[in-house]
From Swiss-Prot:
The N-terminal region contains the highly conserved SGGXDS motif, predicted to be a P-loop motif involved in ATP binding. This is tRNA(Ile)-lysidine synthase. ATP binds at residues 23-28. GO terms for biological process: tRNA modification. The gene is tilS. GO terms for molecular function: ATP binding; tRNA(Ile)-lysidine synthase activity. Pfam families: ATP_bind_3, TilS, TilS_C. The lineage of its organism: Bacteria, Pseudomonadati, Pseudomonadota, Gammaproteobacteria, Methylococcales. It comes from the Bacteria. It is an enzyme of class 6 (ligase). SUPFAM superfamilies: Adenine nucleotide alpha hydrolases-like (SSF52402), MesJ substrate recognition domain-like (SSF82829), PheT/TilS domain (SSF56037). PANTHER family: TRNA(ILE)-LYSIDINE SYNTHASE-RELATED. It is found in: Cytoplasm. InterPro entries: Lysidine-tRNA-synth_C (IPR012796), Rossmann-like_a/b/a_fold (IPR014729), TilS/TtcA_N (IPR011063), tRNA_Ile_lys_synt (IPR012094), tRNA_Ile_lys_synt_N (IPR012795), tRNA_Ile_lys_synt_subst-bd (IPR015262). It comes from Methylococcus capsulatus (strain ATCC 33009 / NCIMB 11132 / Bath).
Amino acid sequence: MRLSLDSFRAGLHPGSTYRVAFSGGLDSAVLLDLMCQVRRVSGIGVRAIHVHHGIQPEADAWSRHCAAVADRYGVALDILQIDGRSRPGDSPEAAARTARYHSLEASLDPGDILVTAQHLDDQAETLLLQLLRGAGLAGLAAMPNAVPFGAGILHRPLLRFGRRDILAYAQERGLSWIEDPSNRDERYDRNFIRRRILPQLAGRWPAVAANLTRSAGHCAEAAGLLDRLADTLMAAATAADEPGTLVLEIVQRLQPDEQRLLLRRWIHKRGLRAPPAKLLERIRKEVVETAGDRTPMIAWAEGTVRRYRHRLHLLPPSADFDASWTAAWSGETPLTLAGNGCLHAALCPGPGIDPDKWRSGRITVRYRRAGDRLEPAGRRGHHELKKLFQEAGLPPWLRDRQPIVCIDGRIASVGGSQWLASEFAGAPERVNIVVHWTP
């Protein structure tokens, strides 16, 4: 498709404020030029963003070039400084891309539309990369045209146009751009596909980029259907009295492929990346399908799936905390529990700690110790905390994290105000001190 102002505007996501990701290269130079033309004829707001990765020695010169171009267009330019260096185990490409997108996402205001310059050939490269990595449908869907992004929307208005169309437009308009030497480095997978593989495929099948992009669209449609099916399965399996957990019996009645679909969606909905396929299958077999009352668990870098009392629990990585920690607390300001949330106290009607005993005693906060006992308000006799936790069905991995509030060294409440000691409990018809724990 020939790239022109009219053909570009026809596919532009409607909006009033656009942020143009501007690297200074060919593709983003064309994108900025087009957006400025749209601004001239329709009055939209346009602002450019340049990400300074600090990797290439030419990075400072590129920033100056982008500033000069933006100035000629009369467009404000924001330069975001990031550390794009890779960490152990990450590819340089992935590290730079992740850092770039995080910075762009954080820069958006509500209602902003971030436009980036990926095009038809980029889409074909992405699909080939995902195929070679053994990706599933979501990965093979490649790059969407528009997607929620931070406070705004990420939009790729050039996906319908090929690299040749973009180059022809730039030459017609007399645009200038910078060349990133790393784009010629075939040690990077994407460059190898771009420079070696796609040209050979195009020599045999000239429409290869368009055809691969069409296949990516089919995969995106199928992935959307599966997501909706997974949401239906998850709604049926989610415990009504414990949102976020799945009822084991319901999950066990599903077919293996439905179980895998559900597990992936469940993990994704919690904001975590699903484990590799082999590990997901281990979770299905060893945690879901294992018979009896066992409490198996499987962890990976992103989280842990555990089974307890006929429920499946998904836990994000927990911050380390010191079980021997103790601290004095006035109760007048919130108390931060390192790696375990915070406590705050408030006067509220209903069950709580007697305000007079609260004010007259020395308040400390700690965690469970061997032999800790409590006489719960409204019950006779002292009980080990371990037994109280078991009665309440508190999962084992949460028991040692329950903050314990003591007055003059004696337990007054546990887990915020979930368990109150009878000797410190106020009359329930009065206004009392209620301790709230936010994990």
